[in-house]
A protein has these predicted regions:
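Conserved ATP-binding subdomain of kinase catalytic cores across diverse folds
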Residues: 1-32, 36-40, 51-62, 66-67, ...
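A short, structure-level motif marking secondary-structure boundaries and short turns
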Residues: 39-42, 112
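Short alpha-helical scaffold element within the canonical Hanks-type protein kinase domain
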Residues: 45-49
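Hydrophobic residue at the +6 position relative to the catalytic HRD Asp in the kinase catalytic loop
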Residues: 69-76
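Activation-loop N-terminal segment of eukaryotic-like protein kinases
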Residues: 76-83
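C-lobe/activation-segment region of protein kinase-like
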Residues: 84-156
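An acidic, Gly/Ser/Thr/Pro-rich helix-cap/linker signature
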Residues: 144-147, 162-169
Length: 169
């Protein structure tokens, strides 16, 4: 709805005001609900992960690194036709980077570390969806291992709570 920018010394300062994200739910809240009440079947979870992966991939394709890609900053909405839309907030720490790989390392690590309650298979499915691949390539394996190593190091300080498990019917 509004954008303003001015130069302050060597830096630029900007403000962005957008419309309310009506009908959207933060992935952090959605996943918390899944942890408390049991996750829906994979066929219902994966469209959310696909929408979040596509949004992140689009940002990285344009050289935009979010720098704080936490589940609380990513929102999804289920549309009437069953499709899922994703939106991201808190872009103030976003930066342009010359390489999608540079963007990916930081943002995928951040999301992975804060999504350790997701099952490993869901996180791997998200990762492959982000990369738009069906099977892991040597580059994808290198990137996955790098992200996992960083997450494990961070987990020694702040271990994750719980894992998502599908509801038992």
């Amino acid at each position: 709805v509004y954008f303003g920018m001015h130069k302050a010394g060597k830096d630029y300062r900007a403000i962005l005001v957008t419309e309310e994200l009506t009908g959207f739910v933060a992935m952090e809240d959605r996943v918390q609900d899944w942890l408390e009440h049991g996750a829906p079947p994979r066929r219902e979870r994966l469209p959310h992960l696909k929408a979040v992966a596509t949004l992140l991939r689009t940002m990285h394709d344009h050289g935009i690194q979010h720098n704080c890609y936490f589940p609380k900053h990513v929102f999804t909405r289920i549309n009437d036709d069953g499709s899922v839309d994703a939106r991201v907030i808190d872009l103030e720490k976003s930066r342009w980077r010359p390489s999608r790989t540079i963007c990916a390392i930081r943002d995928l690590y951040t999301l992975n570390h804060h999504s350790l309650c997701w099952s490993t298979s869901d996180r791997l499915w998200f990762f492959k969806s982000y990369l738009q691949i069906g099977r892991l390539t040597p580059f994808a394996k290198w990137l996955w291992r790098l992200i996992e190593r960083r997450s494990r190091r961070k987990n020694r300080i702040n271990p994750p709570r719980g894992r998502i498990a599908a509801k038992k019917d």
